[in-house]
Amino acid sequence: MEFHRLCQRSVRIILGLLLCSPAAFAQATIVQISDTHIGLSTAPNALQHLQTVVSQINAMSPQPNAVILSGDIGETTSDWTTAKNTLASLNAVVYFVPGNHDIHTTNIATYRQFFGNDYYSFKINNITFMVIDSQLLGDFDTFTSGQTPANVQPLPSSVQTESDSMLAWLGQQTAVTNEIAVQHVPLFPQSLSGGGTYPSTNPYWAIYDVQNDTNIHHEYRKEEVNALTALNIHTMLAGHWHNQRNFTATSGSFTLDLRMAPAVAYAIGTGAQVGYTVHTISSTGGVTTQMVACNGCL
């Protein structure tokens, strides 16, 4: 009898160790869609594209653990409703991220009333996703087109307070082993091997510090880099470019692996396609990304 009890106890200990080990956590499959742009006059096929993408995702086997819509959902609250109703037919849960077509310096409250928090975290298996509102990291409503050097405009004081609150919240989060940032506008542009950056040096395409400004609260990129460094986050899912790209960016000793999703509404750039990405995330946080084209989409 004593031997039997010892055997049972040993089995429980072994099972406990296995369940607590990283290998015991199943990998996660995340579908990222972006830039659906429902209601945009220059994207008349946007809704049809989204409906096609939803059908393709529902046909996946096995089904993804979650779907992330990384910004530029729609132009108006009516378009948001259309997008939500279309996405409601997905078998997987959907997480929304705000983009520059969703949140402006005048309508943050409207977005929150419709979608809930514009920055938050969620967990899939042992992977934590940190959703960040990139619209609180510079004024993307009043950027100066073609300005050299790139110079993002500071947020109005009332919205700057919201930015400070978000960065304070980010600083209060706990660093864990597997953590991924998600936002619409990427933290960095892509450095090209022949020189220059993609899409351009225009401050519209990435997060920048305001130049020639002594207000430390306007060091948007620096503050986010510091926050991600403290959280040991080195992977970011983003959209905004309408072009699927994977690249690594550095700032001092900080390194970030960026996975840019294609757009659902329309593509921008040579070779770009309309579609979505499927991210397979290992139990240790490694990310493998596959681009999937939207069937029959223009």
Region locations from a protein language model:
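Bacterial N-terminal signal peptides
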Residues: 12-22
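Acidic, His/Gly-rich catalytic cores of divalent-metal-dependent hydrolytic chemistry
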Residues: 283-298
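Extended active-site neighborhood of metal-dependent phosphoesterases/phosphodiesterases
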Residues: 78-178, 204-207, 223-231, 235, ...
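Short acidic, glycine-rich surface-loop motifs adjacent to enzyme active sites
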Residues: 175-191
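Active-site His/acidic residue clusters
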Residues: 187-208
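Active-site glycine-centered loops adjacent to acidic/histidine catalytic or metal-binding residues
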Residues: 35, 71-72, 99-100, 184, ...
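Bacterial N-terminal signal peptides that target proteins for export
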Residues: 2-14
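N-terminal active-site segment of His-dependent metallophosphoesterases
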Residues: 25-82
